[in-house]
Regions:
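Conserved alpha-helical scaffold segments that buttress catalytic/binding sites
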Residues: 2-35, 39-204
Length: 204
């Protein structure tokens, strides 16, 4: 039918290629870009499978009713890991994500491993080169490991080491899930954090 009040999102989403995108004069609508990558999780010795996340999220979203007759939604597909080093994939993703951020009122970046955080930061910094950036991470771990290469556990350290205009807040920290070295680094970098049991106390 043509009654948009009956539509679900799979009937309204458009599909485009960011490589061919011509930027509009004003930011409007919503962009979706998947990060179908779990190489960083593998490098961090975690359980792989996160690369299936973007398609799973999109599939669930597609069946939801378009209750508010949303602004135009454009799905730009997924970026997959095809480079020798993860940082190259993160940089590729950042270039594409920045295009979506410039073109739309809202952009949703769908992971994927937690290394999407650094790619998302790079994209945001491309669009807003001089503004301060606030990062909120809901996680039991700081993900500020000191490694020789980018992994799912290094994103926020990478951000803080290269950007004095970035602030970092972590909600849900596990006292037993982070080493003393990570707590020391949090103090050094003035990372704000709330323990998981404090959050549970607030909602109980």
């Amino acid at each position: 039918g043509t009654d948009k009040r009956q539509f679900r999102h799979f009937q309204t989403v458009k599909f485009e290629d960011l490589n061919n995108l011509v930027l509009s004069k004003e930011r409007k609508g919503v962009g979706l870009l998947g990060y179908a990558v779990d190489k960083g999780v593998e490098l961090n010795k975690g359980r792989i499978g996160a690369k299936e996340g973007p398609n799973a999220i999109k599939k669930a979203f597609a069946g939801l009713p378009d209750l508010n007759q949303c602004e135009e939604i454009v799905d730009y597909g997924n970026v997959e890991h095809s480079h020798e080093h993860l940082i190259e994939t993160q940089e590729e993703y950042a270039i594409l994500a920045a295009k979506s951020i410039k073109n739309h009122s809202q952009t949703f970046l769908l992971g994927g491993g937690h290394d999407i955080a650094y790619a998302q930061y790079l994209a945001t910094r491309k669009v807003f080169p001089n503004q301060s950036i606030g990062v909120i991470n809901i996680d039991a771990h700081f993900d500020t490991r000191d490694e020789d290469e980018s992994t799912s556990g290094t994103s926020f350290r990478q951000i803080l080491e290269q950007d004095e205009q970035a602030d970092y807040l972590v909600l849900g920290i596990s006292q037993g899930g982070n080493t003393q070295g990570l707590f020391d680094y949090a103090k050094q970098k003035e990372i704000q954090y709330v323990f998981a049991d404090e959050l549970l106390h607030q909602v109980s």
